[in-house]
Amino acid sequence: PCPFCANHCKRTIVRFSNGNSWVTNNRCERGEILGDPKDASVRQQLADAKKSREQTPNLFKLRQELLFKDYPYPKAAKERDITIGLPRVLSYWETMPFWTTFWRALGFKIQLSDLSTRKIYEDGLSAVTSDTVCFPAKLVHGHLRNLVKKGVDRIFMPSITTVTSENTESTSESMCAIVKGYPIVIRNSDNPEKRWHIPFDAPLFHWYKREDRNRQLTGYMEKTFGISPAETRQAINVADAAEKQFHDEMHRAGKAVLDEVTAN
């Protein structure tokens, strides 16, 4: 076992005939180090490993910051005194820059649910309809209740069955069955409109192409809020720019790390 913390994780040490060793199955960078923890040279290796870890860019943290930051948008022609609740769940972990910017560009206020915690998870457990559904789906129920406590006017959670994809395989266009179907589950299991008198907007979208998305979004916004197609299309363009900025910043950060690895 690894002796460098109280966990004493098991690891595999392969020793070669030339005296070299190779460590595998270690849980962290400390597990790669061999030797007595009391030895000064070993302690120095541990300190170097810790320093290296702290200097390594945390791309997951950066992605989360970029996902939920505010992107630029022009002032809407008409401010709408409606707060749209967006739960930090499922596909929103890919599309949040688009949706927050889209709603703000149309003059709506936005309220996100808090980041997931054990309390949020436990708050929604009573509404989970299946023990076998994935953990991210179980979290949705708690996030809805979190938005209700925040006093939102409406909750928006679209059911998007198909999206365009960077992957050229035709099957990659279809969303995960749970992701695209869970808004329907929520409407029946939690029933926000009946339970909390909060409209739960879960429009069904089939976005095979950009044109489909634009047409369906303009139709939905005109029917639900009386917003003109021209105004919605303008908001879509602004939201697209925000989403592009999100991806561009992630690509730049990833490339910087790869360039550093290649250089070293």
Predicted regions, residues:
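An N-terminal assembly and electron-transfer interface module characteristic of large anaerobic redox
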Residues: 1-264
